[in-house]
């Protein structure tokens, strides 16, 4: 039986797409699967699959010119070489036939180690522009699959694959989800979340407008670990974290969220109207690029973080935007699981 090793982490956005593909491969039972990552969030996300997991210590570049950043980054060359050596040891134990890299800082030493051992690699980039790890490792991969067609066209070995999305997200039904959460069919539901650890800016802006918003909508707020506050406001439900986002999406009439690629493609695949608040100060402006791409196609609205005081007004506009809802019904962006798995199987089995 052929074996594939997945890598990628540092944030949920690098690990959850891997999880979507791992679940598909395990359900077919034809391929052994293992994972290499840090002891961080990717390990907790992958743990439920009960597959072999090899942990490596990997240095993370600190952006900026502060003393703390400079001090940290001085150690990166030595720490990176150590991480490559650790990754090589893990690969020699697992002996995979193929590496699938989802990016993030942990993926880079794994791809470098795989190159030394002549193990073929496939990378996947979810965002409109390549992240640092994928930029540095692209020439060591046989193929770089992308979620955006335009991104693939910029790479010699680029190929459009689409976005991996978990089946549990795609399969949840509105009627079943609302029944499970005790939500009436006619209630207007606003789903709010700010990424894997929540967003203080979104949380604060939402709560300032909460009383008037909950007069019109039932608000489901995934606010992040440690961010639940005492509240007696009716039509407001708080959650630290939700593992089954499929149920939450299925209930929602509108989604307010950050603009990470994984989230945006889930929203589009489910044809949900959305108001996106791109993360400010991101290293390459990836969330702004993602959001602007789909805003230009009329598939979402975008609210810059410095305009969050107008949140309620913008939410009302999205609910009233019938043209957007029609465009969403007609949009052709869907999950890329089958295309990506086709590429994997072609490399594994020829």
Predicted feature locations:
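Structural loop-to-beta junction motif characteristic of Rossmann-like glycosyltransferase folds
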Residues: 51, 119-120, 253-254, 271-279, ...
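Acidic donor-binding loop of glycosyltransferase active sites
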Residues: 96-98, 242, 250-265, 272-273
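Donor-nucleotide binding loops and adjacent catalytic segments primarily
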Residues: 43-45, 175-179, 183-257, 288-291, ...
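Conserved nucleotide-sugar phosphate-binding/catalytic loop shared by glycosyltransferases and other
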Residues: 2-9, 31-82, 304-306
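Glycosyltransferases and closely related glycan-assembly transferases
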Residues: 85-99, 107-122, 135, 139-143
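Short amphipathic alpha-helix
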Residues: 14-26, 41
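Active-site-proximal region of nucleotide-activated glycan assembly enzymes
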Residues: 3, 115-175
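Conserved donor-nucleotide binding/catalytic region of nucleotide-linked donor-dependent transferases
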Residues: 301, 306-332, 350
